[in-house]
Amino acid sequence: MSALHKLKAYFGMVPADEIDEVYDDEVAYRDRYADPDTSYDAPSDRVGGRRRVAGGVRGGFQPEAEEDGGDYGEEFREPARSRRQWAPPETPVRAPLGSDAHREQVSRLRAVTDTGSHFNLSKITTLHPRSYSEARTIGEQYRDGTPVIMNLTEMDEADAKRLVDFAAGLAFALRGSIEKVTNRVFLLSPPNVDVAAEDKRRLAEGAFFNYG
């Protein structure tokens, strides 16, 4: 069949029986000149390495599990993280305010306070020095832990001032205290003795001065 006749058959310009003849000629030509190693497969339903979803594209193309080497059919689960057991910090247990420990502490504080406020005034040594040479006696009494009252009314101004300086240094060295009770009368208290204000007032009145 000539090429012109085939062109007419392509545009429907020949009878129907001649069209079948044209088709048979094409099949015979293909069988004659086709490569025996060439195989014509049916069109694949894969596009770009992806499988087309039946019934149209829904949500795009879905990758095949075989190509990626993974199985998307199984649900991916993140491995469970180990949870550290929380423990409350160790705190010391405090006794309530009404416990015996609190009462014992308050009792101790009161005992110390009472000891200082009710100091026995009869244990206080009262000295009436007439010269600076009697400073040694004052130092020995105070060093033994005895409160000392210095009555400097019988001393001249210069010696009285020197004796006050000596007593102040003595109290500082032994971590005690020196206080002025009244004019030219001083009280030297050891570090473990606290004379109450009422007792100081009585000392100032001269009730416990020993002139013997």
UniProtKB/Swiss-Prot annotation:
Sequence segments annotated as region (Disordered): 32-104
What InterPro entries does the entry give?
A: Cell_div_SepF (IPR023052), Cell_div_SepF/SepF-rel (IPR007561), SepF-like_sf (IPR038594)
> What family does the database annotate?
Belongs to the SepF family.
Localization recorded for this chain is: Cytoplasm
Comp. bias regions, Acidic residues = 64-73
Q: Where does the record locate the signal sequence feature?
A: none
| Role, per record | Cell division protein that is part of the divisome complex and is recruited early to the Z-ring. Probably stimulates Z-ring formation, perhaps through the cross-linking of FtsZ protofilaments. Its function overlaps with FtsA.
* Principal location class: cytoplasm
Q: Which domain of life is it from?
A: Bacteria
For this protein, the record's PANTHER family field holds:
CELL DIVISION PROTEIN SEPF
Subunit structure and binding partners: Homodimer. Interacts with FtsZ.
- One cellular component (GO) term of this entry: cytoplasm
Entry annotated with the keyword Cell cycle: yes
Q: Which UniProt keywords apply?
A: Cell cycle, Cell division, Cytoplasm, Septation
Q: What is this protein called?
A: Cell division protein SepF
HAMAP family cross-referenced by the UniProt entry = SepF (MF_01197)
Whose protein is this, by species? Saccharopolyspora erythraea (strain ATCC 11635 / DSM 40517 / JCM 4748 / NBRC 13426 / NCIMB 8594 / NRRL 2338)
Q: List the GO biological process terms.
A: division septum assembly; FtsZ-dependent cytokinesis
Q: Which Gene3D superfamilies match?
A: SepF-like protein
